[in-house]
Swiss-Prot record:
The gene is miaB. Residues 3-120 form the MTTase N-terminal domain. Keywords: 4Fe-4S, Cytoplasm, Iron, Iron-sulfur, Metal-binding, S-adenosyl-L-methionine, Transferase, tRNA processing. The keyword Transport does not apply. GO terms for cellular component: cytosol. SMART domains: Elp3. It comes from the Bacteria. Residues 143-375 form the Radical SAM core domain. It comes from Shewanella putrefaciens (strain CN-32 / ATCC BAA-453). Binds 2 [4Fe-4S] clusters. One cluster is coordinated with 3 cysteines and an exchangeable S-adenosyl-L-methionine. It is found in: Cytoplasm. This is tRNA-2-methylthio-N(6)-dimethylallyladenosine synthase.
Length: 474
């Protein structure tokens, strides 16, 4: 009888990536298979997030539900990982005796050893340390699950924004070596992955060591990834404006594999609030980045993060945010009401914005961005869009679902053979969260894979001089 593993994941794409690695790790080394049913699992893992309000209470409510399962099955192992685990540590065990393992984002690779310790009789295993980036050396080879894949390129953040817990829960910025990243992506490409999403708390701070001891920048990494055979689209999440340098913008000008969509958090349009947040830039600097980006890549779509009701935010500050939203024309946003995170500098500031006022501001902001997104979507009506087909449609499994370069979901009628490939569709209808497409052509009609060897090019432009030396003139 196979051993079962159930993982519940909250939070960002980095957590989703970490959870997939936990499943791969325990599957390869200990033979566990994933199950959606917690009641039939031998191990329950909760991968937590501490960004939002009441994150800790959410964890303990879930553990309370799992405790009833452990009461019925004393051999059940329960583990808590992620940022809440890193932040709370032993306090989780003190409050929830049913927990056997507590591990941080940087120690998930030690899970097999921790499980063995519990099996041998240890009452609780806690490891929330920050080893350099050792975990990537201990994880099994990547396994593709469809045509898209997340690839972590770095961990942590060293910006210390006043509202953010990430530097305290995931540590400071540490970059993976270039060769490790390229190998992982090449392995995924061999398995049919066509699009990679490079992950990190601040990817444009990437500074990875190379085989010769030099340092690879994020812009250079993007070009290396674009050169990998089979990788046709590159996305990345997430960035910080103060390190969105000109060399990164230049990649948008000459690297078509990099999609015409960028998520660049700004948090506020008020210089006063940006200063209080310790973001390290002003609104005009953010606008300068976007202006240069749109010069390098016409039509690029921009999304962002916004925090509403940060301590001291006035009506004038919020008006500055709305002005920035209109000037930039954001296509999408992740926007939240501010909630103090314990241990951050902003937690000591007086939260003097009325909750009803916060809710009203959030509704106004979200409504404006929804309007802007719908306007962009309507402009796509009648156009032909190239989409990567990810699988069956969520609402209608008889149809297919794909995603445009600018990150819009398109549902259309197509054949199963198109899954994992690119197709061209005409946009025939627009909805709030998706588009409707009509199939135009498949990848076999696009000539995407044509490649010319250098000798072929030379043969077409062969010019011998008097000495018989071949010269090439493009």
């Amino acid at each position: 009888m196979s051993k079962k593993l159930h993982i519940k994941t909250w939070g960002c794409q980095m957590n989703e990536y970490d959870s997939s690695k936990m499943a791969d790790l325990l599957g390869e080394y200990q033979g566990y298979t994933l199950t959606e049913d917690a009641s039939e699992a031998d191990i329950l893992l909760l991968n937590t997030c501490s960004i939002r309000e009441k994150a800790q209470e959410k964890v303990f409510h879930q553990l309370g539900r799992w405790k009833t399962l452990k009461d019925k099955n004393p051999n059940l192992i329960i583990g808590v990982g992620g940022c809440v685990a890193s932040q709370e540590g032993k306090a989780i065990k003190d409050r929830a005796q049913c927990v056997d393992i507590i591990f941080g984002p940087q120690t998930l690779h030690r899970l097999p050893d921790m499980i063995e310790q519990v099996r041998r009789g240890d009452k609780a295993v806690i490891d929330i340390s920050f080893p350099e980036i050792e975990k990537f050396d201990r994880l099994p080879e990547p396994r593709a699950e469809g045509p898209t894949a997340f690839v972590s390129i770095m961990e942590g953040c060293s910006k210390y924004c006043s509202f953010c817990v990430v530097p305290y829960t995931r540590g400071e910025e540490v970059s993976r070596p270039l060769d490790d990243i390229i190998l992982e992506i090449a392995q995924l490409a061999e398995q049919g992955v066509r699009e990679v999403n490079l992950l990190g708390q601040n990817v444009n701070a990437y500074r990875g060591a190379t085989h010769d001891g030099s340092i690879c920048s994020f812009a250079e990494l993007l070009r290396f990834v674009a050169a990998i055979d089979g990788i046709d689209r590159i996305r990345f999440t997430t960035s910080h404006p103060i390190e969105f340098t000109q060399d990164i913008i230049d990649v948008y000008e000459d690297t078509p594999e990099l999609v015409s969509f960028l998520h660049l958090p700004v948090q506020s349009g008020s210089d006063r609030i940006l200063t209080a947040m310790k973001r390290g830039h002003m609104a005009i600097e953010y606008k300068s980045i976007i202006r240069r980006l749109r010069k390098a890549r016409e039509g690029i779509q921009i999304s962002s993060d916004f925090i509403i009701g940060f301590p001291g935010e006035t009506k004038e500050d919020f008006a500055d945010t709305m002005k920035l939203i209109e000037e930039i024309g954001f296509d999408h946003s992740f926007s939240f009401i501010y909630s103090a995170r314990p241990g951050t500098p902003a937690a000591d500031l007086p939260d003097n914005v009325d909750m009803e006022e916060k809710k009203q501001r959030l509704a106004i902001l979200q409504d404006r961005i929804t309007q802007q997104a719908m306007r962009y979507s309507r402009h796509m009506m009648g156009t032909v869009q190239r989409i990567l087909v990810e699988g069956p449609s969520v609402k209608n499994p008889m149809e297919l679902r794909g995603r445009t370069e600018n990150n819009r979901v398109v549902n259309f009628e197509g054949l199963p053979k198109h899954i994992g490939t690119f197709v061209d569709v005409e946009i025939v209808d627009v909805y709030t969260n998706s588009l409707r497409g009509k199939f135009i052509r498949g990848e076999d009609e696009m000539d995407l894979r044509r490649s010319l060897r250098p000798s072929d090019i030379l043969a077409k432009h062969k010019q011998d001089d008097d000495l018989g030396v071949t010269q090439f003139k493009p």
